[in-house]
UniProtKB/Swiss-Prot annotation:
This is Large ribosomal subunit protein uL22. It comes from Cenarchaeum symbiosum (strain A). Keywords: Ribonucleoprotein, Ribosomal protein, RNA-binding, rRNA-binding. Part of the 50S ribosomal subunit. One of its GO terms (biological process) is cytoplasmic translation. InterPro entries: Ribosomal_uL22, Ribosomal_uL22_euk/arc, Ribosomal_uL22_sf. The lineage of its organism: Archaea, Nitrososphaerota, Candidatus Cenarchaeales, Candidatus Cenarchaeaceae, Candidatus Cenarchaeum. HAMAP family: Ribosomal_uL22_A (MF_01331_A).
Amino acid sequence: MGDFGYSFEGYDPTRHVRASLREKQISHKHAREISLHIRGMTVEKARDFLQAVIEKKRAVPFRRFKRQVGHRSDPGVMAGRYPEKSAAEFIKLLDNLESNAEYKGMDLDRLTIVGAVAHKGILIKRFIPRAMGRSTPKNNVLTHVELVAREA
């Protein structure tokens, strides 16, 4: 595995804490929409929101990837979905972020997410054999997610 950096600029090791997921099999589109929504939340509020998404009580608003996505009755959400697998991975990432903050001696109740970014990872190419000697490509895009929090 290669050497990974962070896309967050202005990182101060005394004020910020960060965590990342690398090469996970989750949708990069779902990860982007979740990242956009939890940025600015406290860690506890983000965890409660993601738990509600897994229980299908609150929808993640889709702002960019919203074609053919149904409307939801949540306030402030026009088009939205319930990406359970991505939300579960984000909860694990929040646990990692809290562990890193605890190691640094930060107050966990005052952590606010200031950077949440999702990137496309590597492409895994596979092929499905079809009739008459043809084959259909089946590509799988892995995802990188980065979280940065600041003690407010």
